[in-house]
Amino acid sequence: MSSIRKKDVERFILSDDYKPMVLKELYKKFRAKTREQRKKVREVVKKLEKEGRIFRDSRGRYRKLGEDLKVGTIEFTRSGYVAFVITDDFEEIAVPVEDTKYAMHKDRVVVEITGTWRGLPRGRVVRVLERGLKRVVGVFDHKGTFGFVVPDDPKIAYDFYVAPENIDGAKPNQKVIAEILKYPSPGKNPEAKVVKVLGDLDDPSIDLPSVIVKHDLPEPGEFPEEVIREANAIPARVRKKDLVGRKDLRDKVIVTIDGEDAKDFDDAISVEKLPNGNYLLGVHIADVSHYVKEGSALDQEAFKRGTSVYLIDTVIPMLPFRLSNGICSLVEGKDRLTMSVEMEIDRDGRVVRYDVYPSVIKSKKRMIYERVNEFLEDPSSMKEYEPFKDLIYNAVELAEILREARRKRGAILDIESDEVKVILDENGQVVDIVPRKRGIAEKLIEEFMIRANETVAEIFDHAGLPFMYRVHEEPDPETIFQLKNYLEAMGIRAKFSHKIHPGMLQKLLEKVKDHPLRSSVERLLVRSMKRAMYSAVNIGHFGLASYAYTHFTSPIRRYPDLVVHRLLKLYLEQNGYFTPEQIEKFSKVLPKIAKHCSRRERVADEAEWDLVAMKKVEYIARHIGEVFNVVVTNITKFGLFVEIPEKSISGLVHISTLDDYYYYDETRNMLIGKRKGKVFRLGDVLKAKVVRADKIRGEIDFVLVEEDEE
């Protein structure tokens, strides 16, 4: 009996000679008669199907993907008219809802390209490969003896039928978690069973678990047993043998500067002024790779998570707290293992010399952003920082030099964040929402981390070795043309050349620095940008105007940084050389890691945004009927999106509530009244009354009011 080799089966299926076959035909082809032989064939088929290289058609045949067939994750929209399939290469394919073939939000699907739609490829779903959702969170609705779960996520187009035996004591209008039993099919709703009743809709404590289930995140602080076992086996202190091959920096003045609530300290800095007038900047990053070994249970779980998720006052860490808040965290007064990037920087912001090496440090002070800013305002107010004044003043000087150097090369610097801090009480209820301010301390740490990330990326770019880059594509020319039209409609003239460069956009920001519409221009600019992501191919970072960039500085909370540390260590150990086998290995695995981590980052961002949006609705619900000054942030054919600037709370003024029949001028992004000729533009400051706040949908409605209506 001849043995069957999996690689032969895979080679045949992927060959040009292969014609679509059912499983029985593959068994026959390879003379697979025993259970073990057939199992090998099935395993290859399942592997290729999971990788999206083949799929099973309606006749049960396994087909290869041709030019007209793509595999990706389907994402529905709130409107429900169209969905988008995001391929593994981040290509977007528009799929009209009637062509989604019972696929649900987040399913992995095969889509056939059928044409174009608004500049994107248009397609239809031909098969669901893998269901993306296993659980759903929503509101329970009782219908006689049975019930339905109405999902919180408007992107899920179905309500889930719940049989009487699966209600589990849920009452109408309670938030529940339900396990999906059956997925949609012709003429039938999907089915689910209630597995947990979270509570009543007005209970603020249900928001966090709702977001966790909606985005399929792990429970805070929970890890698989094997991961916990590995973490517990790691020593809680640095040992003598850990210091071999490391530069001892424990006597140097090295400090951390972070937010008041931070517990996982990834990065520390040292700054000295040299006799020649240059600066010596040290960026010292937690050596997580010393403890988290490639292929270990800790590593596999960190890869799966991809990133830590910060949900207001709760963190879902990438690594167990024993590491993230313990031995890896650069806490004051404790020996800690680090990877150091030491850079001599001249008065023009150029790195004239650098060194990268494994090290051991002992942080001399755990500084806090707000207190450093207070010290810079009034040194006498912060006596505890007095011994570190030289470091602080040198850091401020150097950060300004680096920032000016980035400005000169065209980096986009002047976009003010509209991030807010949500303050909760012990019950999870919103007390207040305040702008998250960024002072000098926050900006100087940002400058130092950017420079360290660039230095590490440049090493690998020059060496031509496989690497994990952080890339940011330039905007599409059509988007910039549209931006120009919008700006002109706001009365702001902008000169854009055919060759798009970040310096053009930075000049625009400088031009509107003191303009009343500055924040509106910044929003438009952000909207016109593409999303930064991870890639094994270096295409540069548009926003930073960096020709090579990476993420090296946060390995406690980002998996790509951990990968970069491993690559950097190997580079140093092997004197800037990778073996052919290593090059082959990294060339295969790095693109997969980059795609996965880009997806996980997106999930984390959406979860963080969702919870903040819920809390904004909860906050504004206490102000129904009140009038606020608002700014128009977006205009659509169905109304105006407006924002309360000091709270970053947005909502809709529906076109049906306006005082005239308005038509939408898409080119200039305006609503124009037909009878009165009144025009609404981006950046308009108006008065609006809050009339509705729907926490489940995350929606807020306003109506405009005249001065005399207040």
From Swiss-Prot:
EC number from the UniProt entry: 3.1.13.1
SMART domains, per the entry: CSP, RNB, S1
GO biological process terms on file: mRNA catabolic process
Substrates-to-products reaction catalysed: Exonucleolytic cleavage in the 3'- to 5'-direction to yield nucleoside 5'-phosphates
EC primary class: hydrolase
Keywords recorded for this protein, A-Z: Cytoplasm, Exonuclease, Hydrolase, Nuclease, RNA-binding
A GO cellular-component term linked to this record: cytosol
Domain S1 motif: 625-705
Membrane-crossing segments per the record: none
GO MF annotation list: exoribonuclease II activity; RNA binding
Localization (cell): Cytoplasm
Alphabetical list of Pfam families matching this protein: CSD2, OB_RNB, RNB, S1
Sequence ranges assigned to domain RNB in this UniProt record: 246-573
InterPro entries listed in its UniProt record: CSD, CSD2, NA-bd_OB-fold, RNase_B_OB_dom, RNase_II/R, RNase_II/R_CS, RNase_II/RNase_R, RNase_R
Keyword Repeat among record annotations: no
Gene3D superfamilies in UniProt: Nucleic acid-binding proteins
Purpose: 3'-5' exoribonuclease that releases 5'-nucleoside monophosphates and is involved in maturation of structured RNAs.
Similarity section: Belongs to the RNR ribonuclease family. RNase R subfamily.
Designated name of the protein: Ribonuclease R
This protein's encoding gene: rnr
